[in-house]
A protein has these predicted regions:
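Ligand-binding clefts/hinges and TM-proximal coupling segments of bilobed small-molecule sensing domains
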Residues: 46-55, 100-104, 126-164
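Acidic, polar ligand-binding/catalytic clefts
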Residues: 22-33, 95-106, 116, 194, ...
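Periplasmic-binding protein-like
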Residues: 85, 89-126, 152-155, 172, ...
Length: 257
């Protein structure tokens, strides 16, 4: 399936070649080999935290999204990327010169964030997640967005008319959970959010922004909930309330072949 964001990546790579630095040969076989490397990550993510806390001798390079990090890796500006497994697979599927290493770094769980104290919305979201897992809709979304053959199918989900709108905040550069297809933001989280909006009796609106600005937007009331492959960390729980987990992921390493 053609994805606009990775088409942008491919085009950008062509223009970036002129300014790329010499790529050093990097051999990574274990966590220890990551020390002293220049490692990219998405700002505000588990990968960034891992580099800062578990790899004190590595240089942490934080990017707005995985697309920018991938360009820097391809051009030799950084040596590796630490990112969630499924987005890493999408990157490597579209870039044959990159590959994934699973070094058992850390696992985490994704959950939906709401403003602290918004128990009405939180309870509704938890019920929707539970119902989806019971009636088969959750498994259907997994099959659509995480197929074994890699051929993603975007399901048609009826958007029920609602009384007012509910705004989902996300960073639409994290496939297959959220990404841009044509002019629309789609993905596993976006599809799940449509079910959440339907059950809550609201019309869904999706707001795309920088990942590390999502919690501030939630606290200010600019958005109603966050669905962005966000890990439910204890630090974040000080500022938001999280739903029950809906997906378990792990951090992997992307390197040049």
């Amino acid at each position: 399936m053609k994805k606009v964001l990775f088409a942008v990546l491919a085009v950008s790579a062509v223009f970036a070649l002129a300014g790329c630095k010499e790529k050093k040969n990097v051999v990574v076989n274990s966590k220890a080999d990551l020390e002293n490397l220049s490692i990219g990550c998405q700002a505000g993510t588990t990968g960034e935290i891992y580099i800062q806390e578990d790899l004190p001798n590595a240089k942490c390079n934080s990017f707005k999204n995985v697309i920018d990090a991938s360009l820097s890796l391809k051009n030799g500006a950084i040596d590796a990327i630490i990112i969630d497994e499924l987005p890493a697979k999408e990157v490597c599927k579209n870039n044959s010169d990159l590959t994934i290493l699973d070094l058992d770094l850390v696992t985490d769980v994704y959950a939906i964030a709401v403003k602290k104290g918004n128990t009405k919305l939180l309870n509704s979201i938890n019920k929707t997640i539970a119902d989806m897992k019971t009636d088969g809709r959750y498994e259907s979304l997994v099959a659509d967005f995480m197929p074994a053959d890699g051929k993603i199918k975007i399901p048609a989900i009826e958007a029920k008319s609602g009384n007012g709108k509910i705004i989902m905040g996300t960073n639409a550069a994290f496939p297959p959970f959220e990404y841009v297809e044509g002019s629309k933001i789609v993905g596993f989280d976006a599809a799940m959010a449509q079910y959440i909006a339907n059950d809550y009796g609201k019309t869904l609106e999706i707001s795309d922004m920088a990942f590390d600005g999502l919690i501030a937007a939630l606290q200010s009331g600019s958005i109603d909930f966050i669905a962005a492959g966000m890990t439910a960390t204890e630090e974040r729980r000080q500022n938001v309330d999280f739903s029950e987990p809906y997906y378990e992921s792990k951090q992997v390493v992307i390197v040049r072949k």
